[in-house]
Amino acid sequence: MARDKDVFIVLNADGTGKWTRYDSDGRMVKGESYKNGAWYYFDTATGKMAHGKYYRDGAYYYYDTATGIMQYGEQTIDGDEYYFDTETGAMVTGEVERDGRYYYYDDETGAMLGLGEQIVKYAEKFLGTPYTWGGTSPDTGFDCSGFTQYVYSNFGIDLDRTSSAQRRQGEAVDEDDIMPGDLVCYSGHVAIYVGNGQ
């Protein structure tokens, strides 16, 4: 009888199967399990060790695809970026503030939004902030270029201070090619395109 060890059980003729864990009494472990400084999860019905993105208890978690160890923080899964709470391991959605910056994840899938979509989401936080000539912060108010400079800085993009200077940065695109998060520049003014012609 297996005791206090992980055991691979072959279930199919091609050699595939499941990893399981047995405690010191020889009982199959089910649910959460802590071992050698790491958390694992075993299906409560089958005892199969969780690997990859795994849904349980109302949230998604991510377990290393080889070892089954619960992962935390930023993770790349099938080419998309996700973030798993650094304390609970649960996948986050929506707005997340970390390292002094804001990030945005899809409310349904948890995948990080594209940069343009994140810029729009962050900009929307400041709707209703008063217009102030020369303003550069949400505490004192913004003018147009102060607003765009402030929003873009959250994403590590350094814009010049005035609308005329910002117009000279970046690359011009045709109106048909404009994307959410792009700057829209016109005489004496600059704004952020949010999509749908706005």
Predicted regions and their residues:
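...with weaker cross-activation on analogous glycine-rich loops/strands in unrelated enzymes
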Residues: Q149, I157-Q198
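Solvent-exposed, well-ordered amphipathic alpha-helical segments
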Residues: G37, G58, Q75-E81, V96-Y102, ...
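Extracellular adhesion/carbohydrate-binding repeat motifs centered on closely spaced tryptophans
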Residues: M1-Q118
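Glycine-centered flexibility sites
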Residues: G26, G31, G52, G73, ...
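Generic structural signal for beta-strand residues in well-ordered domains
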Residues: N12-A13, E124, V184, I192
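Residue-level recognition of conserved structural "scaffold" positions that shape functional pockets
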Residues: T44, A59, T65, D107, ...
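N-terminal capping segments
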Residues: L113-S145, Q149-T162, Y186-H189
